[in-house]
């Protein structure tokens, strides 16, 4: 019983296959090629290419499939991308239906010039072409029910308006807009053939700077002054790969910024080394900025990478200005202020010593004369102007006090009074020398700027990086 039913089912299902095989053999048989030729001639005879299928009736439904071969280039400068694809359209034309041969007919690509085809075009196309090696890459396939499958291998460069505010941490949406040029929705309708499976090959695409995160298929109608037109949109969501920019832009900028801090560990009086290092790092950052601007369009807003390079440039430039500040404090403003203070102290000391000598030396036992003191002060000023500012303190050492012995005998009372007077003068000179020493800038005060810079610059730069990456990555 079951065997009989099984054999019956096998006979029912195998009958169409047997018929198809017989027909295929009959078609491929050279003796029956005349039948195929007569069928094609009959279909093309009287066919009017100027009229769409079902002219005057319902609109022609055109289904579309896209098999993406590659995305060759995404250009930020030109705001476009280049796509190579197999573009297929299918519609039904009752004028091309046949029942003599129950098989599909794949015809020569030149037959497409004798049939009606949709006036499809790419709305955001800049430049497109159909491949022609070794012959024009077109396909025409007819089905017995009149369905026509029309395929093309196309390379198109389509416009893609990009928002580069977050470049190179950005995501872009690039679309391919497909539309009918002349036929309105009263004559033609577009739809994605196979719904979500209408576009294939996306997952196989590999781009050097981007990753395809997602894609969407959109069907809509657009209204112009000439009527309503069908439109299909294929939208790619592209995420830029940051690896290239880490190696080519971010890491060099970070290393150059850190290199500019080396000057904080170089001695303050090594002007040639510190200035050369600062200028070199500034020029290197300028070169990186210039190279980056050449690879991007001239846009009116600031990009994320501009913010980072600008921040690095500021840190490098501030490191150069830091040495200018140290140099000015030690070799500029400091010595001028020290010289003025030394002159005031010397003048006051000379005047007071002259008055005291005139009043308290009846026995002609005096300190160094005013002329000798002035000469010694002039010598100290010359030393201060030519050498290290610390050397000015040497002019006021107590050992420079000299006495001139009188030729006349002295009483013990006068000797004691003179000794007390000399002791007072020595003490006063020591105090003057101590005050002058205090006004001289210590090297530790100048080096403190470098010590603070060694901490301040890395901390602020680290904070800048944390804020930058948290903001643009999230």
UniProtKB/Swiss-Prot annotation:
Secretion signal, residue range per the UniProt entry: 1-25
Cysteines paired by S-S bonds: 160-174
Name of the protein described by the UniProt record: Gamma-aminobutyric acid receptor subunit beta-2
Positions contributing to histamine binding: 121, 180-181, 226
Taxonomic path: Eukaryota, Metazoa, Chordata, Craniata, Vertebrata
Binding site for 4-aminobutanoate: 181, 226
Activity: how regulated: Allosterically activated by benzodiazepines and the anesthetic etomidate. Inhibited by the antagonist bicuculline. Potentiated by histamine.
Chain ranges on the Cytoplasmic side, renumbered to this chain: 327-451
Post-translational modification Phosphotyrosine, affected residues: 403
Gene name per UniProt: Gabrb2
Glycosylation sites: 32, 104, 173
